[in-house]
């Protein structure tokens, strides 16, 4: 080897040794103490153990909602360039679709071209204008004159900078994801949950192909199990991931960005009670010593015990479905059962209904369903009461002194008090017959319109409105669930409010007498009707209906809180008035319009059918209200069948409910005691 080259090598090696020695000197002599301190530092890590939500039980301790383990898919922003991120996200969305794991997409534009707006009917009332107005108002650079196609282009070019080359369907997928992720605070810090409760095939594929999905992780979660399928869906509600706005409101209460929260129904109302306390395991790694491990176990949320009887709820829901199927015109309905002694809601049924377990996946389809399955008709639907209001009109007429108990009003088939307005009794319209002389009890039994036309005229609208308010008609009952309607009792003030012309706003004598037979401008919720009938049953006490019986600790079963009967009003009513009205209602099921339904029924009860007109060329709504047993009332029932034609059709639902309540259709099984289920 050349001597010069060898010398050069020696010099380089010598320099390297000098540098190494200098570095060692620096580390030991100059920085030795700081490096020693660093070596003694402890490294800690914390793992969070998610707490399960509290179970929801019926009044006998039978589970309505419990928990199970599942998986969600979360995505965090990484350093991927935008075009690579879009390609990866699209691959993930296709994988989710192909493995049967739906993902949420809240962008209110159709999935496929030609793109159209698809604003959702959030309230289930058939209107989307409020949602559309709100959506546009929250966006600064998107205006109402832009088409759905233009908005897609705007998001592509100016918001998410999505490159060309994607099919219209894939472009819509990507924009939908980016839109939802932005609402969810998608960033390098906050993971966005793109899909909940995914299939095992999804989990397997993502784990096997992890190198293809940078920033994507599979996370264990607790998910709700709805033990009885669609049962009580509108009561129980459901959970879902919080949006950015909810997170800002709740983060100071210990919520994490990807926590699931109650979104509807009891799950939402009792969020603070049902939510558990997460556990933590803290591991401190100490160089040269054993790890220090400290942990706090997760505490499940409290149990919620409802007033609902699972068997009665099931009977009500099945009967609604059965009767809607049997009546060609009927398409929906609701039923409410109350304990007349304390306001417990024993059943609250709606038809059609939905599966709370798949609500998030089915949402777009549900809100576009013309039958409005997510609408809680029992508390939000308002219906013209028809003849079910006649017991209330009778009370107002008797208590105000407008008529007396034995006073007879003659039904000639046509009410001719007014020269220019001559309404008919239903019996005249059907068969050109009359009821003849009627006292108040007979008039209720026979549902004689002519009697109530005259009684209403003599009583006057002010007194009828006053007694309606006494019995809670036209005001919310106070049930714990949101979106309860107030209903409305017909009045001059209301007609003036809704009228669009002076002529429309004018109050006529005909409005008074139409009010007295449950028509005109009166409309109430099924729960209001049930509560007013409960007052007739219990002697005039208006309780606040409630669904929550108690909250109990998941640790030891102790009572955290308990709902006491809350008296909202005590109506003053003479015993003679109650007796006359109750006897009239007894006659309805004994000899009147509901007698065929309840022929030879072993339990005596009192009821009133109602056939309410809802518009020209539309089938009438069918209503039925009742209480039972007659002599010692326990329950009040209200049933509405939309387009059910005749009130006695709704009575069939009430009969099925009473069969279950009184154990007439089966051997009454033993109910499970709540305390047996607690730890």
Language-model features, listed with the residues they occupy:
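Membrane-proximal periplasmic segments of bacterial cell-envelope enzymes
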Residues: 1-272, 278-292, 296, 326, ...
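Short alpha-helix boundary/capping segments
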Residues: 80, 84, 573, 642-650
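Solvent-exposed, polar/charged alpha-helical surfaces in well-ordered, non-transmembrane soluble domains
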Residues: 83-94, 196, 204, 208, ...
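A conserved hydrophobic secondary-structure block that centers on an alpha-helix together
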Residues: 291-341
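Conserved helix-loop functional segments at active or binding sites
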Residues: 322-326, 351-354, 587, 663
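Amphipathic oligomerization regions
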Residues: 642-664
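Flexible helix-coil linker/hinge segments at domain or subdomain boundaries
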Residues: 663-672
């Amino acid at each position: 080897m050349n001597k010069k080259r060898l010398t050069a090598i020696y010099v380089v090696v010598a320099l390297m040794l000098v540098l190494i020695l200098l570095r060692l000197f620096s580390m030991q002599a100059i920085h030795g103490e700081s490096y020693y301190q660093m070596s003694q530092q402890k490294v800690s890590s914390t793992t969070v153990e998610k707490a399960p939500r509290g179970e929801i039980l019926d009044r006998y301790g039978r589970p309505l909602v419990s928990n199970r383990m599942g998986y969600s898919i979360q995505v965090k922003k990484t350093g991927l360039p935008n075009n690579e991120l879009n390609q990866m996200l699209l691959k993930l969305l296709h994988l989710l679709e192909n493995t049967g794991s739906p993902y949420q997409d809240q962008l209110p534009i159709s999935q496929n071209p030609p793109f159209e707006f698809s604003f959702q009917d959030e309230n289930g009332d058939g209107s989307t204008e409020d949602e559309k107005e709100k959506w546009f108002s929250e966006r600064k650079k998107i205006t109402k004159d832009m088409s759905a196609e233009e908005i897609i282009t705007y998001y592509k070019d100016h918001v998410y900078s999505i490159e060309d080359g994607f099919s219209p369907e894939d472009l819509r997928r990507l924009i939908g994801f980016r839109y939802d992720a932005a609402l969810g605070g998608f960033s390098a810090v906050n993971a966005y949950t793109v899909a909940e409760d995914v299939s095992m095939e999804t989990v397997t594929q993502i784990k096997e192909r992890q190198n293809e999905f940078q920033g994507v992780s599979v996370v264990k979660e607790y998910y709700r199990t709805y033990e009885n399928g669609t049962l009580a869906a509108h009561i129980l509600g459901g959970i879902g991931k919080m949006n950015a706005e909810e997170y800002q409101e709740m983060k100071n209460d210990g919520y994490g960005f990807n926590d699931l929260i109650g979104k509807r129904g009891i799950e939402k109302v009792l969020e603070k009670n049902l939510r558990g306390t997460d556990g933590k395991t803290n591991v401190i790694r100490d160089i040269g010593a054993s790890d220090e491990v400290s942990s706090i176990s997760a505490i499940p949320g409290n149990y919620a015990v409802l007033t609902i009887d699972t068997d009665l709820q099931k009977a009500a829901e099945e009967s609604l479905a059965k009767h809607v199927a049997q009546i060609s015109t009927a398409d929906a309905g609701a039923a409410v059962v109350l304990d007349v002694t304390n306001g417990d809601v024993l059943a609250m049924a709606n038809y059609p209904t939905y599966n709370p377990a798949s609500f998030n996946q089915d949402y777009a389809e549900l809100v576009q369903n013309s039958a409005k399955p997510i609408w809680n008709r029992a508390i939000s639907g308002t219906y013209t009461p028809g003849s079910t209001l006649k017991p209330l009109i009778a009370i107002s007429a008797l208590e105000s002194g407008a008529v007396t108990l034995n006073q007879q009003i003659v039904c000639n088939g046509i009410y001719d008090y007014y020269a220019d307005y001559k309404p008919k009794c239903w019996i005249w319209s059907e068969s050109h017959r009359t009821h003849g002389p009627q006292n108040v009890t007979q008039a209720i039994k026979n549902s004689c319109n002519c009697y109530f036309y005259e009684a209403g005229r003599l009583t006057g609208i002010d007194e009828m409105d006053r007694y309606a308010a006494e019995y809670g008609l036209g005001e919310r009952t106070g049930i714990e669930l949101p979106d309860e309607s107030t209903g409305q009792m017909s009045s001059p003030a209301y007609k003036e409010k809704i009228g669009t012309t002076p002529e429309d706003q004018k109050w006529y004598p005909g409005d008074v007498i139409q009010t007295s037979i449950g028509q005109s401008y009166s409309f109430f919720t099924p729960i209001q009707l049930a509560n007013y009938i409960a007052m007739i049953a219990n002697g005039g006490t208006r309780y606040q209906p409630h669904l929550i019986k108690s909250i109990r600790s998941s640790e030891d079963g102790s009572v955290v809180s308990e709902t006491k009967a809350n008296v909202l009003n005590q109506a003053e009513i003479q015993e003679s008035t109650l007796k006359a009205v109750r006897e009239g209602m007894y006659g309805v099921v004994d000899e009147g319009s509901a007698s065929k339904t309840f022929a030879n029924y072993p339990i005596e009860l009192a009821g009133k059918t109602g056939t309410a007109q809802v518009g020209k060329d539309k089938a009438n709504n069918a209503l039925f209200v009742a209480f039972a047993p007659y002599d010692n009332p326990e329950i009040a029932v209200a049933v509405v069948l939309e387009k059910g034609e005749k009130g006695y059709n709704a009575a069939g639902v009430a009969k099925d409910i009473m069969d279950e309540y009184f154990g007439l259709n089966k051997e009454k099984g033993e109910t499970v005691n709540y305390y047996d289920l607690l730890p």
